Amino acid sequence: MKMILFFSDLDSTLIYSGYPEHTCVEYNEAKEVTYMTAQGINFLKDLLVRKDFVFIPCTLRSYEQTARIDFLKNGNVPIIICDNGFSIYENGILDKTWDNLMKENLATYPTDEIKSDIEILVSSNNMCCKIKNNRNAFFTLIFENAESANMHYVTIAKVLKRHKYKLELQGRKIYIIPDFLDKVLAVKYLCKKFNPSLVITAGDSSVDKSFVEEGNQRIIPSHSSLNIRNTIITKKSGISAGEEILDIVMSLLKNQKLNIK
């Protein structure tokens, strides 16, 4: 049986922070983190029970952060792409073949040097932020708020421009990522492995652009700044766009079934 793969970013695509009037789908130490609409949750539940359909989250998050999300617990979603494509987990187990390939690519990058440069940069500029090392693959600077992250972005970019790293600003976080590392690499790897009949993709930010373009059917929320040709754009924005994306996926699956007949 041919599989249909749905690769989707999570934050600001399917799940959203700042919507306490909706259903919380993620807690961190009893604190509410992200939300979905009740209808969006129902759509996702309906999708996850299909035998011909595989939902594969594709996120900048670590595995530990991703595993906090309710619908990703208890084996409901067997495959997860984490760490901006650096890590693939299947049934909670790291894909060693993929991991070795990524580590080979990373070996040419001065991770210890850039880690030192980041620490010096933060200290010398009195930046009030937390430095997070993501499997030694990339680094995250977590500021108190988005304003602080914006204020320091240019300084960080100037200091780190000699390295083969790219910067991604998202809210109060600045991601410092090796230029080779892209979610699309993991997406292509899994598509080759499963040879799906249909690939659906969804994402909202610049780190999603390449993998969204890999889809036969591509969806982006209307609040996204992405500009991709031949893409379905939701009519709604914010958390309602997450619900609409899942509704669109269900419609695409229905049409796929009709076309097969």
Where on the chain are the PLM-derived regions?
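Mg2+-dependent phosphoryl-transfer enzymes with acidic/Ser/Thr/Gly-rich catalytic loops
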Residues: 177, 184-261
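Glycine-rich, phosphate-binding/catalytic loops in enzymes
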Residues: 22-26, 73-75, 218
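Active-site phosphate-binding/coordination module
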Residues: 36-123
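Active-site neighborhood of HAD-like aspartate-dependent phosphohydrolases
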Residues: 2-6, 10-57, 66-67
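Short glycine-/acidic-enriched loop or helix-start segments at secondary-structure transitions
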Residues: 17-18, 66-69, 91-92, 210-211, ...
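Short loop/turn segments at strand-loop or loop-helix junctions that form parts
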Residues: 7-20, 83-85, 91, 134, ...
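Conserved acidic, metal-coordinating active-site core of Asp-based
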Residues: 119-214
